[in-house]
Amino acid sequence: MLVHPNPDPIAFSIGPVDIHWYGLMYVLAFAMFIILGRVRIKQPHIAAQGWKPEDLDDMLFYGMLGVVLGGRLGEVLFYQPGYFFENPLEIFKVWKGGMSFHGGFLGVLIAMALWARKSKRNILDVYDFIAPMVPLGYAAGRLGNFINHELPGRIADPSLPWAMLWPNPNGIGFLDTPRHPSPLYQMLIDGILVFLILWPFARKARPRLAVGAMFTLLYGCARFFTEWFRVPDWETTVMGLPITSGQVLSLPMIVAALVMLAWAYSSRDGRQTLRST
């Protein structure tokens, strides 16, 4: 059995300004977007579409706004509306954590649609381009959740080698029963594993929307699975089976991804895009 290291959420201070680990994970995520993006624009089928390094800088600016605004708004609306209604000023304290991936996902889609319109690019091509860079950034965010000891897991069998004593939310000691380290599960499965599958898939020319749809499908399925190990923000039942808030939000992603994949591989537009790269 393991014990959560329970580090100080403040990594270091510069004068009166505290730099939080959670914020540093977002910096790491944005840096990986640029690094992976520079690798991606050198791939022949991507270079043929005319992507340039300066496009990455523009997309990063739009994407940062989409992630932060959408992620926070999603946390408020999807997960903790009651808490934020009673404590509205807490909405602005993003350094404490509390960012919804599903909200950030929608925020980034809106931001990329705006950038695509500005740059006169097809939004489907933009989604295909950025999708392989998302999972590692997501993994960094989940590591930030772990450092902040957020998203505690469900009670685990003490004999499980990686069962973990989790810090008590009241700040004193640890919870009595070991837990699944759910942020690490989501970092490894929803983030790193999805990246390891998606990146090789995206290295070859695919029909328009195929890469974006594959990311949506992989993440939706991975998130649906890892939600079983996480204490849900809220839970409901579907056909008599308990289902968590994250699973409710992931199901539409899975359905939409299957529709998008079918369109990508059967539509004339998707096949034409593949022939032109």
Q: Where do the protein language model's features map onto the residues?
A:
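Hydrophobic, membrane-interfacing alpha helices
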Residues: 1-277
